[in-house]
């Protein structure tokens, strides 16, 4: 970008000038550091203090730590990075001083001992064999000095990403904005047109194709590990897509031209820019809808003139911190790295809440590998990625047997620990060092191979060959090393990142299986931060039974604002119920302090809190007043009837309620029938008033009559709708049929051998017509029940099942439909013979009946 401004006098800085570090005076006294010392001396003293506080001065290999720290400090000073390290320390120190949990590390930064000493990371790089050069390499750093001022090449600067506890992330950002006022902003990103979108839109507009037709075409565009192929690659990989493109050349040609063009701009979700200069002096700015400043330079350009920080909110840290706080533990000093933790990976079936491991691919790899220590767990995370996944079975066999395939005896000590597979980029670096290069040079090789810098590869290939000759090594080593370098570029992973994240995976495993009640409580509390909180609650609730924990119903009398422990179980929090606003909740809790003696008190409190009768009726149907042991449909009718009454009529009902055991309907009926006088000696209701009351009451009564015939389903429906899960009835129990094939759950089906006949009822999460790689059309359905999820497929096959289903009037299920499915179990799905959509309906208002 700078090259475009050479004709202008200093339009922007010639590089990144680091923001001026403002170290608070209190730090000098607190850390016993002489005020007025240089930033380098301040950083050095921070490290010396940490050597004692972290017990490094007691280690047998303490000299290794001293030498490494000395080397890293020298490199930081030489390259001009001291202030950058202190910037990171200052931000993370603010978090630590304010009891804001931070992560163990992310990316290559975990390879720096200095960052570990100043608590920016919490993974010991020497203990885990991590390389500093993977984080900072002199061979790929550049600085310019202009008029005595140092400017850094932003594209070659180190990059520290910081994980912050999710709910406290904004506090850290506010600190940065306050301390560097006028010099911070968010960062612009550009969103581009995907090939899949282009082919669909061009198909509709240029090819005049229907929506179904273009969807069918886009479905055959291949994807690998969730990433959709570019159009030119899809053309080579898919015969079906190639056939379409050959017959619709104009559509394909235009779509290829549009693919990759900027569609719109966005804001980087975690990035924040900090500059030495005021923002308006060096860059154009714009404002978000919330009034926050955003650079008008996009992400790659702004890094050439300012420092970019990633402040990421990590929900897992919220869960870990909440769990530890309740137990009185310090999560940075947990005894998680022991055989007692890794035994849970030997037969893992409940991955919810385990950091990284709960993702489907990672879970699959973990079950296959069965890691026995932190290093093997790091290998699991590294293998669960495109390319690397091909080596899963090979590595799993090595873990089980200890046998591996040697590519050359010279490298066995490096590759033997990972089953002969260069799982980590650092292993390639070790191989390069072993033939005679420095770690800096090894990082250069890794970088040019990883970035596919084709023009630089031949020179380095020759250098390696010459170095091997110079050191009188086997000439075959040259070809072996270069092949590993080229191949591993497609799958090798950063060991620093893998170890950091594996540490958090191990911590969550330790907490979940040793303190399940506290861990699940924290998971449920954090569900509010998820994009779909109720879906998250449902997923969490599916595992609770395996730990002998019940998720007790929300109760307007017993529940607290948030989820809480009750005996050996967990009580649902009122703030997680759909339709209950923060204001209503606050009012409800305030009224509840005087204790509800009966349901009429509850009806009054709900109205005073601002809860409308529709929401209250739904809450009653969901069981939030079950402590009064009433039939829910009837209790809802009581609340609705009570709501119709005038204030005078309500007073009179309260006077006689105890006589009728607080049954509102009986009290109203008796008072009206016997024309009893109220507290003012007037009749309870005039005939005219009764006619008005009766008209409204009849509407509610009709709904009651309809729903009470399916009360079990009504209870399930409202629980699922408002809470995300059903605690009184399992879906299977609601629709069980004694005389027919037994309904199974997703868990029971998962335990069956393939080819077993199955019948299941579930809620549709997704349903879509698709086309297989072989060109066969099928209906894909993803369903869920209280135990998990399962994918199902209805295909034609020899019996034309799909065709017969639609010709017989069958419809594609919609999200949240309830379906009964019949078929046979495959490895991890069901191949369907037939399906039926259940038409049971719950009525919530009179218009439902009229329609």
Could you say what each language-model-derived stretch is?
Residues 1-2:
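Charged alpha-helix within mobile-element recombinases
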């Amino acid at each position: 970008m700078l090259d475009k401004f050479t004709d202008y006098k200093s339009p922007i800085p010639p590089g990144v000038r680091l923001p001026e570090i403002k170290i608070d005076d209190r730090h000098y006294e607190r850390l016993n550091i002489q005020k007025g010392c240089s930033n380098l001396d301040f950083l050095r003293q921070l490290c010396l203090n940490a050597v004692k506080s972290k017990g490094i001065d007691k280690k047998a290999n303490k000299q290794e730590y001293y030498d490494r720290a000395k080397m890293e400090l020298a490199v930081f000073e030489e390259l001009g990075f001291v202030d950058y390290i202190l910037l990171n320390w200052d931000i993370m120190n603010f978090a630590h001083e304010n009891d804001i949990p931070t992560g163990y590390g992310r990316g290559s930064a975990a390879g720096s001992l200095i960052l570990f000493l100043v608590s920016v990371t919490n993974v010991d790089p020497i203990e885990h064999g991590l390389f500093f050069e993977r984080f900072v390499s002199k061979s790929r750093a550049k600085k310019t000095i202009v008029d005595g001022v140092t400017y850094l090449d932003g594209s070659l600067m180190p990059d520290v990403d910081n994980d912050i506890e999710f709910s406290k992330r904004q506090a850290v950002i506010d600190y940065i904005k306050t301390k560097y006022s006028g010099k911070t902003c968010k960062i612009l990103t550009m969103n581009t047109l995907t090939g899949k979108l282009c082919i669909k839109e061009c198909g509709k507009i240029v090819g005049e194709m229907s929506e179904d037709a273009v969807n069918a075409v886009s479905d055959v565009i291949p994807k690998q590990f969730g990433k959709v192929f570019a159009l030119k690659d899809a053309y080579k990989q898919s015969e079906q897509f190639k056939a379409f493109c050959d017959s619709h050349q104009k559509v394909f040609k235009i779509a290829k031209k549009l693919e990759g063009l900027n569609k719109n701009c966005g804001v980087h979700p975690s990035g924040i820019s900090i500059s030495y200069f005021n923002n308006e002096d060096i860059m154009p700015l714009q404002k978000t809808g919330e009034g926050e400043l955003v650079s008008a330079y996009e992400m790659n350009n702004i890094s050439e003139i300012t420092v970019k920080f990633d402040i990421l909110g990590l929900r897992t840290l919220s869960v870990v911190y909440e769990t530890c706080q309740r137990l009185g533990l310090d999560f940075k000093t947990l005894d998680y790295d022991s055989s007692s933790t890794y035994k849970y990976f030997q037969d893992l079936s409940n991955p919810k809440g385990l950091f990284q491991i709960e993702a489907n691919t990672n879970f699959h790899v973990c079950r296959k590998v069965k890691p026995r220590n932190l290093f093997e767990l790091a290998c699991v995370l590294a293998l669960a990625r495109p390319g690397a996944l091909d080596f899963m079975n090979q590595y799993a066999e090595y873990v089980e047997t200890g046998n591996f395939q040697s590519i050359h005896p010279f490298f066995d000590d490096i590759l033997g620990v990972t089953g002969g597979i260069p799982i980590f980029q650092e292993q390639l670096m070790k191989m390069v060092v072993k033939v005679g290069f420095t770690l800096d040079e090894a990082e250069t090789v890794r970088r040019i191979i990883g970035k596919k810098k084709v023009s630089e590869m031949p020179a380095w290939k020759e250098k390696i060959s010459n170095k091997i000759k110079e050191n009188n090594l086997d000439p075959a080593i040259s070809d072996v090393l270069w092949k590993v370098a080229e191949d591993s570029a497609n799958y090798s992973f950063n060991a620093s990142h893998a170890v950091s994240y594996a540490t958090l995976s191990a911590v969550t495993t330790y907490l979940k299986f040793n303190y399940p009640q506290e861990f699940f409580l924290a998971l449920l509390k954090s569900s509010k931060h998820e994009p779909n909180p109720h879906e998250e609650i449902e997923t969490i609730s599916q595992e609770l039974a395996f730990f002998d924990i019940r998720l007790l119903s929300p109760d307007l009398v017993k529940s607290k604002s948030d989820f809480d422990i009750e005996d050996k179980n967990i009580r649902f929090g009122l703030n997680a119920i759909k339709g209950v606003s923060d204001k209503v909740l606050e009012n409800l809790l305030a009224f509840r302090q005087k204790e509800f003696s009966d349901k009429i008190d509850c009806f009054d409190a709900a109205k005073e809190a601002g809860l409308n009768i529709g929401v209250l009726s739904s809450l009653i149907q969901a069981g939030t007043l079950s402590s009064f042991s009433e039939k829910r449909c009837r209790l809802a009718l009581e609340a609705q009837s009570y709501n119709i009454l005038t204030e005078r009529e309500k007073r009179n009902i309260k006077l006689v309620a105890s006589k009728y055991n607080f049954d509102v309907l009986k009290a109203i009926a008796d008072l009206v029938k016997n024309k009893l006088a109220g507290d003012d000696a007037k009749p309870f209701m005039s005939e005219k008033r009764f006619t008005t009351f009766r008209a409204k009451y009849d509407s509610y009564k009709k709904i009651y009559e309809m729903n009470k015939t399916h009360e079990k389903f009504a209870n399930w429906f409202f629980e699922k709708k408002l809470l995300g899960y059903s605690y009184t009835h399992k879906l299977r129990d609601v629709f069980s049929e004694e005389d027919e094939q037994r309904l199974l759950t997703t868990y029971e089906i998962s335990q069956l051998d393939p080819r077993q006949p199955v019948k299941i009822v579930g809620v549709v999460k997704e349903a879509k017509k698709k086309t297989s790689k072989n060109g066969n059309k099928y209906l894909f359905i993803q369903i869920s029940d209280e135990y998990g999820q399962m994918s199902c497929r209805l295909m034609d096959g020899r019996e034309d099942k799909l065709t017969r289903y639609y010709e017989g009037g069958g419809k594609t299920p919609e999200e949240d439909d309830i379906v009964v499915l019949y078929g046979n179990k495959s490895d991890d799905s069901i191949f369907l013979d037939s399906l039926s959509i259940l038409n049971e309906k719950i009525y919530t208002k009179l218009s439902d009946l009229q329609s």
